Swiss-Prot record:
Coiled coil: none annotated. InterPro entries: AceGlu_kinase-like_sf, Acyl_CoA_acyltransferase, Asp/Glu/Uridylate_kinase, GNAT_dom, NAGS_kin, NH2A_AcTrfase. Disulfide bonds: none annotated. Its main location: cytoplasm. It catalyses: L-glutamate + acetyl-CoA = N-acetyl-L-glutamate + CoA + H(+). Its EC number is 2.3.1.1. PANTHER family: AMINO-ACID ACETYLTRANSFERASE, AMINO-ACID ACETYLTRANSFERASE NAGS1, CHLOROPLASTIC-RELATED. Keywords: Acyltransferase, Amino-acid biosynthesis, Arginine biosynthesis, Cytoplasm, Transferase. This is Amino-acid acetyltransferase. Residues 299-438 form the N-acetyltransferase domain. Belongs to the acetyltransferase family. ArgA subfamily. The gene is argA. One of its GO terms (molecular function) is L-glutamate N-acetyltransferase activity. Pathway: Amino-acid biosynthesis; L-arginine biosynthesis; N(2)-acetyl-L-ornithine from L-glutamate: step 1/4.
Length: 445
């Protein structure tokens, strides 16, 4: 009798919510030349194919920096850099095109494999490349002519979406044509970032040399807001060797992730190309493995003060009257106002949530979550949740829980799962209202 491991079954079951959540979503993946040259590249390709088979719409952007350098070295040639951007003259352009063309064919061939006894057995992927991106020259900066180094002029999002809807993987490289028929060398990080923004992608994913953004203790930072990511960028720009792969690839992608999030891409992920299965672990497991930069809002998110009491009452009173929220008096709000986080727009409070920590149990309750009816079509509930998670982690909280009668599905979509009354902190358990019969859901941090 064969001994069967339950680990596979358990992992497969736990991934189901993420499979459902990602199905039909558009994700832009950046594979730098360093990732393609790594021994783990074939596993990355297998994981991208798996994502596609699970219904994810994939745009794959590749770079060619080390491959270009290798070809230049063979010819005993070098290209100058200006502000960390390669100056691509007429002589080096042919080498850049050669490297990019070889990688395009190699990636397409890898995605086309469907041999038996391989992870891609039975897959039949269509890979589409073309002039989806139109370029223009960077021009002259501080007296330096970038020649055939360029930037994006426009992106044919309609054509890309049409290819994605037909089930194809769209493959984009660092070479793009201009309206004059010339070729230009683009930064792959810029291509990935701008494509994600223009497509209004759900995720931007970058394979980098590190596991993500690494803190001073050597651990990957799981989640960053754009403002926090910018602080890391400033620090790393000073501390890191400007000629290193981290500076040229990871740091540049992190800047792109910040730009993408601020332009409306909900999440950008940094994962290591050296770790087998990093892509699957990041997207289809609860804990993830890398760093994600999550969307911040142009609206102000801040801790509430006493002057906000009237606005909070105006926001939550209709929900209290409907029985969705537990009624709070003005006096109670005045006493607890420091526990509230609000979203403010043009002087109007359009969202709020409160955090009640139970330090001894390392738990915290997220309560009184409310969004103004005119602003419920965005991601403001998720924005408040992200702030609550960030705030909870800073004070050593390991689990957030909520009591809800009407929003069970929304919280479950965010990774919460149902727990019993006995799992509540002792002080909260004694206050549980059995007549209201609120569902209790928890989210480990």
């Amino acid at each position: 009798m064969k001994i069967r491991s339950t680990a596979l079954v358990k992992g497969f079951r736990q991934s189901t919510p993420y499979v459902n959540a990602h199905r039909g979503k558009t994700m832009v993946i950046l594979l730098g030349g360093e990732a393609i040259a790594d021994k783990n590249f074939s596993n990355i390709i297998n994981d991208i194919a798996l994502m596609h088979s699970l219904g994810v719409k994939v745009v794959l952007v590749y770079g060619a920096r080390p491959q270009i350098n290798q070809l230049l070295d063979k010819q005993s040639s070098q290209t100058p850099y200006h502000k960390h951007i390669r100056v691509t003259d007429e002589n080096s352009l042919s080498i850049v095109m050669q490297a990019a063309g070889q990688l395009q064919l190699a990636i397409t061939a890898s995605l086309s494999m469907s041999l038996n006894n391989t992870p891609m057995a039975g897959t039949h992927l269509n890979v589409v490349s073309g002039n989806f991106v139109i370029a223009q020259p960077l021009g002259i900066d501080e007296g330096v002519d970038y020649c055939h180094s360029g930037r994006i002029r426009r992106i044919d999002t309609e054509a890309i979406n049409r290819s994605l809807d037909q089930g194809s993987i769209v493959l984009l490289g660092p070479i793009a044509s201009s309206v004059t028929g010339e070729c230009f060398n683009l930064l792959s990080e810029e291509v990935a970032t701008q494509v994600a923004i223009k497509l209004k992608a759900d995720k931007l994913i970058g394979f980098c040399s590190e596991q993500g953004v690494i803190d001073e203790e050597g651990n990957a930072v799981a989640e960053l807001f754009p403002s926090d990511a910018e602080k890391f960028i400033q620090k790393l720009s000073v501390d890191v060797d400007p000629d290193s792969d981290f500076h040229s690839g990871t740091l540049r992608f992190l800047k792109g992730a910040v730009a993408a999030c601020r332009a409306g891409v909900p999440r950008s992920h940094l994962i290591s190309y050296k770790i087998d299965g990093a892509l699957i672990q990041e997207l289809f497991s609860f804990d993830g493995i890398g760093t994600q930069v999550v969307m911040a809002s142009a609206e102000q998110v801040r801790q509430a003060c006493i002057d906000d009491i009237g606005g909070i009452l105006e926001l939550i009173r209709p929900l209290e009257e409907q029985g969705i929220l537990v009624r709070r008096s003005r006096e109670q709000l005045e006493q607890e106002v420091e526990r509230f986080t609000i979203i403010e727009k043009d002087g109007l409070i359009i969202g709020c949530a409160a955090l009640y920590p139970y330090i001894d149990e390392h738990m915290a309750e997220m309560a009184c979550v409310a969004i103004h009816p005119d602003y419920r079509d965005g991601n403001r509930g998720l924005l408040l949740l992200n702030y609550m998670k960030h705030r909870s982690k800073s004070i050593g909280i390991e689990q957030i829980f909520v009591l809800t009668t009407h929003s069970v599905h929304w919280f479950r979509e965010q990774g919460f799962y149902e727990i019993g009354v006995d799992s509540l902190p002792m002080a909260k358990k004694s206050l549980y209202n059995y007549q209201r019969r609120s569902k209790i859901l928890a989210l480990p941090l």
